[in-house]
């Protein structure tokens, strides 16, 4: 299994910041959490590459952004990160209509890992009530968000905090 160098991964994330205004620390954090920068990793559910993109997510990105990414594009590190970032930001944009940016990012990260249907079910059953977060949100999903936050903080320290 081949790993993408940290510096190269960061450059891809910076390109997304330059091209789309995406938070490079957030994108980097998702790459580390999803794949530990292993380029050709594939999950048991069929998610592929650095950002662990599923066919469903690929179709959603193509539909939302009117792009023509292919399954072959998932094998190209820079494209895999771009597709994953677009998918994540699709959900950030969606949740920002109703919530603050902080909450929208939290929910988008949950969707990225758990799926929209599960997150919507959680919200419909008291997910907005802070008292019920630990009761209704599976521990591994909360842990996933914590891992992304940890890598976000790490990336800001490692790469410098001048972006975003």
Regions found by a protein language model. Give the residues of each.
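Non-catalytic cell-wall polysaccharide-engagement segments
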Residues: 3-7, 11-20, 56-164
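Conserved alpha-helical segments that form or flank metal/cofactor-binding pockets of metalloenzymes
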Residues: 24, 34-47
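Alpha-helix boundary recognition
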Residues: 31-32, 149
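Solvent-exposed coil/turn segments that connect beta secondary-structure elements
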Residues: 33-36, 56-58
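Solvent-exposed, flexible loop/coil residues
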Residues: 41, 45, 54, 78
